[in-house]
Design a protein with these regions (language model features):
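Structured surface interface patches that mediate subunit assembly and partner/cofactor docking
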Residues: 2-17, 24-44, 64-80, 102-104, ...
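Short amphipathic alpha-helical segments enriched in leucine
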Residues: 19-26, 52, 56
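Oxyanion-binding "anion nests"
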Residues: 113-117
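Conserved alpha-helical segments that form or flank metal/cofactor-binding pockets of metalloenzymes
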Residues: 48-94
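Long amphipathic alpha-helical segments that form oligomerization/scaffold cores
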Residues: 86-111
Length: 223
């Protein structure tokens, strides 16, 4: 398993790529709809602006974990973080993205994200891998939570690329770690391995996250 410093380095590289894309957007691109379908399909899809709001909170949760350091046994890891009913978590996540961007404009968000991403990496580097804090659902070690943020960055980076109709920009290390976590998630939730036709890691990530169609009835694993 990758070292904590390696995990942080991979997360930093992913977040740098995400921040660079957001920083380069024209005003009208912030209003482009994502392809994400809410749990309630009657609701509007996030635009790129709401996706930025989700990035802010999902990555910023790392800082909350560190600030909430506690003497507790970890109850989840980088894989089990993603074992939860979408019907329950999806509406909360959907609504909170709107809360995060309330009162903000597209001109504000690149700076907001840059600050959140920079502080997240700096604070993660300043604490030991074994630190335990609130991991949203349950206590988690910071190294495990940081690894789960790589999945968030890669998968939602795909959402950003799809909304903008640009090539995917995840790093090889980020893709490899995300694919490995999704492999482990498949093993924990069902039986067997990923389909042979999804042997390429990016193809696997797209199908396992529901960002591409798949004939495998075990998929998607995450929403």
């Amino acid at each position: 398993m990758a070292s904590y410093e390696s995990v942080i380095g991979t997360l930093e590289a992913e977040l740098t790529g995400v921040a660079d894309v957001f920083r380069g957007l024209a005003p009208e691109q912030w209003q482009r709809p994502t392809l994400l379908v809410p749990v309630d399909p009657g609701l509007p899809r996030w635009t790129v602006l709401e996706l930025a709001g989700h990035f802010d909170i999902s990555i910023g949760l790392t800082r909350m974990l560190i600030a909430g350091r506690e003497d507790a046994q970890p109850a989840r890891d980088r894989t089990s973080f993603f074992i939860n009913p979408r019907s329950e978590t999806g509406p909360v996540v959907y609504a909170y993205a709107y809360t995060m961007v309330e009162g903000k404009t597209s001109a504000d968000m690149p700076g907001v994200l840059a600050e959140t991403f920079t502080k997240t990496i700096a604070e993660a580097r300043a604490v030991p891998a074994s630190l335990v804090g609130p991991g949203y659902f349950a206590p988690m070690r910071v190294d495990e939570f940081a690894a789960s943020r790589i999945v968030e960055a890669v998968v939602h980076g795909i959402d950003l690329a799809q909304a903008l109709d640009v090539p995917y920009f995840a790093t090889p290390d980020g893709i490899a770690m995300t694919a490995a976590i999704l492999d482990d998630l498949l093993a924990r939730r069902t039986t067997g391995r990923r389909p042979q036709e999804l042997s390429a890691d990016m193809d696997w990530i797209l199908a396992a996250s529901g960002r591409a169609e798949s004939s495998d009835n075990r998929l998607p694993l995450i929403g």
